[in-house]
Amino acid sequence: ESRNIRLQEVMALIEELVAQIPMAEKLLEIKGVGIRTVSGFLAEVGDISRFNNPKELQKLAGLALVENSSGKHKGETTISRRGRKRLRYLLFEVAMSLVAKNPEFRELHVYYTTRRLNPLKKMQSLMAVAAKLLRIFYVMLTKSVDYDPKM
């Protein structure tokens, strides 16, 4: 019981701290994104203004695309995985939540997996959705705009 009480105290403290961050409440308006996602994202990324573009943020998360090629061999394109593992895991978890709860992201996932040209496997699609969410977070935090599903 004392562990549950301590956990509730820590979560209350996290909610207080997130409430102090400008634009954090805007991120919570996205259906499927919760306080743990926002607090984890902000803790891992830090000051968003140090990034010049969303590609730098994708690289930090290890979601940058790299091609496995050498000489005449052209291999598959995969994510680099050379970033922060916890941030990538957090984004993957929220991508699953978004695909389940948010109609815009579900539609995007269905499109990625069923498109005629280069359909993605389910895991690849979830990583693409995670990268999309990362770009949305970047735009919302740097430009101080509200969430627009057409973003």
For the regions a protein language model found, what residue spans apply to each?
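A detector of single, family-specific signature residues
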Residues: 1-151
